[in-house]
Amino acid sequence: MVKFLKQNKAVILLQGRYAGKKAVIIKSFDDGTSDRRYGHCLVAGLKKYPSKVIRKDSAKKTAKKSRVKCFIKLVNYQHLMPTRYTLDVDLKEVATLDALKSKDKKVTALKEAKAKLEERFKTGKNRWFFTKLRF
């Protein structure tokens, strides 16, 4: 079978707390691991999307509207819907399986992921990824 859930592929989560949110695959485990015996992947996604910025907004308000909130999570392949989009953000060193094990490592990983995704948003690339799904 062809492996199409590769690194940097944009996906939409279908189940759980972040259902309907967009995420990007960081690392995939096609054959599973010893503790999770099914195909799954590590994803980083947007918990809260940036708001629409208008011209008359002040610089302070524009900065506030450009903020994003992130999540890092292990997700079963069954709970993902792949898209045709890819996101060229290097989150491999930021979010690791080790970062999910302890609270303080996860907090630092979330801050770094947030910074990288906000920087990507401000450059204006991957506009589709930073827009909320309408459904």
From Swiss-Prot:
Q: Name one Pfam family in it.
A: Ribosomal_L27e
Could you tell me the superkingdom of the organism this chain comes from? Eukaryota
A molecular function (GO) held by this record is: structural constituent of ribosome
| GO BP annotations, alphabetical order | translation
Please give the PROSITE patterns that the UniProt record associates with this protein: RIBOSOMAL_L27E (PS01107)
User: Cystine bridges: which residues?
Assistant: none
Q: What PANTHER family does the entry give?
A: 60S RIBOSOMAL PROTEIN L27
For this entry, the protein name equals Large ribosomal subunit protein eL27y
Task: Record the organism.
Answer: Arabidopsis thaliana
Q: What is the lineage of its organism?
A: Eukaryota, Viridiplantae, Streptophyta, Embryophyta, Tracheophyta
